[in-house]
């Protein structure tokens, strides 16, 4: 499961490649464990420092919450690392840029032009885990809900194509096929807007 060896080998071989690391706040298969709880755990910043130390040429973070990284770049005191205090590594390494997920396509295109091994860390909580936490009252439900008015919908399907969201579903009406948002599967991330 560890991709670190593959990244290390790509760097050693001088391969032009971009790795995408999904940091989704959940451990797959075994279910529901959080990641990065402990100081020696694997936060995005700690992963970024490890990759930078391995020799990754360019490293970026793409997230739906770029504001949580505001002020967390370029501040690492390397003496804290040498002194054996990995818990102090909570800032991103120098040169790591943070982008909103809306810029994912552009960032991927830029990274594929960079010579050497590059890494894109995508930081967003798993949508299924978010829905589970909302259902259990552990995560606040957003105040806004997206609804498609079937009486106004022209049935063109552009909203499905543009958002690429599975919750935008076709519905047959007396006026033909229209679209609606399935609220039970909606992640409330507003990617369809």
Predicted segment positions?
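Extended, hydrophobic alpha-helical segments in both membrane/secreted and soluble proteins
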Residues: 1-13, 17-20, 47, 148-165, ...
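Thiamine diphosphate
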Residues: 1-33, 37-45, 105-106
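Glycine-rich phosphate/ribose-binding loops and adjacent secondary-structure elements
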Residues: 2-3, 8-9, 132-134, 139-145
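A general structural signal for short secondary-structure junctions and capping/turn motifs
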Residues: 8-13, 49-53, 108-114, 155, ...
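Short coil/turn connectors at secondary-structure junctions
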Residues: 12-18, 24, 54-58, 114-117, ...
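Short beta-alpha connecting loops at secondary-structure transitions
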Residues: 27-39, 71-73, 77-81, 88-93, ...
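Structural signature of the thiamine diphosphate
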Residues: 48, 55-136, 186
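Iron-sulfur cluster-binding cysteine motifs and their immediate structural context
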Residues: 123-125, 129-136, 154-193
